[in-house]
């Protein structure tokens, strides 16, 4: 189990959860040992996990029925927003003595995907719904970068990933896109494009260049020499 917690911590750091430490896989207090995190880190984790189709299916399931020869079992998801709020697509409830009621939820409307996290909140379901209603009204999804051609000082440059963000109109106006060129562009990567808002970086992607391979035309004697080399 210690090894699994080690892997969990490595993954957490890999997705930017810099204020999180896991000591076990359950998330529960274990004597003097305690898992700790922040609402921001939990939002990063949930936003990352919801992109996994199996995870999304599990956390978005309202109830599941299992029949055996002896009995039928029905389990209900404790995330009440799945039933009471039409835009909710998943989430996870929790409780510990120190953190009290914890709730992580995800919601999606008109292409805008949001995550809300609360700790020690006795009105968590109501607060989550209120926050979603507030920000769905002011946020729009913008495609910041599109996979394919990108304008640089070189011809035939492109990126291999698209990038979208949910922003207010004011945030969109303040968004910065910066192209950084590498000194050595002998490879097919000539630099990177960086997207930031209020000095915080949100996305970085390598910029590639399509280098044309020119066909070398051989004269009659060069063709003979080439053929002799191939035979030997």
Predicted segments with their positions:
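Surface-exposed aromatic
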Residues: 23-31
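Domain-terminus/edge residues, biased toward the C-terminal soluble/receptor-binding domains
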Residues: 17-21, 33-232
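Short, charged, amphipathic alpha-helices and their helix-cap/turn boundaries
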Residues: 2-21
């Amino acid at each position: 189990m210690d090894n699994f917690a080690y892997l969990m911590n490595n993954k957490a750091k890999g997705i930017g959860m810099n204020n999180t430490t896991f000591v076990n896989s359950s998330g529960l207090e274990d004597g003097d040992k305690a898992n700790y995190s922040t609402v921001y880190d939990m939002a990063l984790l949930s936003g990352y996990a919801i992109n996994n189709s199996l995870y999304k299916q599990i956390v978005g399931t309202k109830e599941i029925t299992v029949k055996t020869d002896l009995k039928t079992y029905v389990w209900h998801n404790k995330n009440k927003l799945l039933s009471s709020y039409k835009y909710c697509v998943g989430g996870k409830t929790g409780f510990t003595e120190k953190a009290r009621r914890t709730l992580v939820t995800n919601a999606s409307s008109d292409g805008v995907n949001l995550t809300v996290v609360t700790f020690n909140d006795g009105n968590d379901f109501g607060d989550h719904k209120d926050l979603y209603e507030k920000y769905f009204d002011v946020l729009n999804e913008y495609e910041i970068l599109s996979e394919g051609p990108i304008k640089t000082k070189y011809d035939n440059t492109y990126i291999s990933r698209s990038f979208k963000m949910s922003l207010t109109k004011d945030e969109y106006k303040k968004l910065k896109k910066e192209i950084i060129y590498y000194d050595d562009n002998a490879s097919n990567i000539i630099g990177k494009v960086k997207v930031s808002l209020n000095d915080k970086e949100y996305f970085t992607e390598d910029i590639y260049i399509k280098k044309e391979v020119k066909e070398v035309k051989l004269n009659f004697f060069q063709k003979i020499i080439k053929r002799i080399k191939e035979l030997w």
